[in-house]
Amino acid sequence: MRRVVSLLSGLLVVLLVLSSAPGAAAENWARFRGPGGAGISHDKGLPVTWTDKDYRWKTALPGLGHSSVCVWDNQLFVTSALDSGRQRLVFSLDSKSGKILWSDKLASRTHSKHQLNSFASATPASDGRRVYVLFSTNEDTVVRAYDFKGQRLWQADVGPFHNKHGHGCGTSPIVWHDTVIVASQHDGPSSIVGLDAATGKLRWKSDRQVRLTAHSTPVVLERKNKTPQLFFSNTGDGIGSIDPRNGNVLWRANLFTTRAVNSPVIAGNLVLAIAGGGGKGKQMAAIPVDQSGEVASDKVAWTRERNLPYVPTPLAFGNHLYFWADNGVVTCLESATGKDVWMQRVGGKYWASPICVDGKIYNITDKGEVVVLASGAKYQLLGRTQLGEPVHSTPAVSQGRMFLRTFKHLYCLEAGKK
């Protein structure tokens, strides 16, 4: 009996420790496209249609930015910019009330950019101890760390971000264990770097020959008893894999002749990436993740060149992939084979990427219409809701709340409201 009591007591201690750990009570949305960059939330009860009365709160955000919201526990982080990029802004908000808890400015320089980009397009990332933001110009790419009270902790410059077409920067930082990773892949000497999360000091640097500026954000695959892999994409390397512990290149598949804008996606034992640009068409390849060195074309699982998204990142959920193209054509495919399951034009133009919440797929048009589809082998439109403002930002979901960023406001939609 004493042994049983002792075991139960030990279990209680473990549960208490786990429940008191940061973010243990709910899944945090701590980077671009949430946990693992997969764009998937298991939160339940969020509506598929709603009205203005259903928002928990709505907060005006000064300036303009296309970054998405980073969420850790009850705190939100988002960026913006004023005065043609000369002032870059960081905001932290209370997720329950929408109240701005603190803000900070970073003096910067203006530069040319695509008319549909912003000077604050990189989504913040967090590890629960600090939040990390990224701003770039032609002369520098600045990563700055804050504590959750808004205190500046460190700042690092990982080099210029040149772009002969003047599109500006679109990649976001990510955090892997105690390393902040930034992919600075542009029209100049490029690299992917790992910074010490506590100090900002350089841990490793992997030089890349990019050829055309890439805006993709890397993703990390971790498996038991396997070397972790950081997947990235660009024109020079195609799809590549780096060891995030030291920056060593594990393999690369040089398959692309156009630029990578959306991000790599892990689908089962495959990693896939897309490249495209202008009137040059698009390219996509899916590759088994276990490779080494230079990957030959016969190692590629499948490829595709039609109905591909350029800016929106694909979504992998269950056994299916969802390509939500910029022109509003959505294609559902079998992940393993690339075989079409269904295809439907839902209308609108898209800069945001689709996310999946409790099996339902959400995306937002550039005019601010939220479109919700059912996941699965049969096309089903679940709802359409007008935000009434332009949108280029991907939704974020955490703790039963969805955060929708427009050009002017941040909206909070709560589960169970409708």
Report residues per predicted region.
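Positively charged n-region of N-terminal signal peptides that target proteins for export
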Residues: M1-V4
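Bacterial N-terminal signal peptides
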Residues: L8-S20
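Noncatalytic, solvent-exposed loop/strand surfaces
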Residues: P22-K418
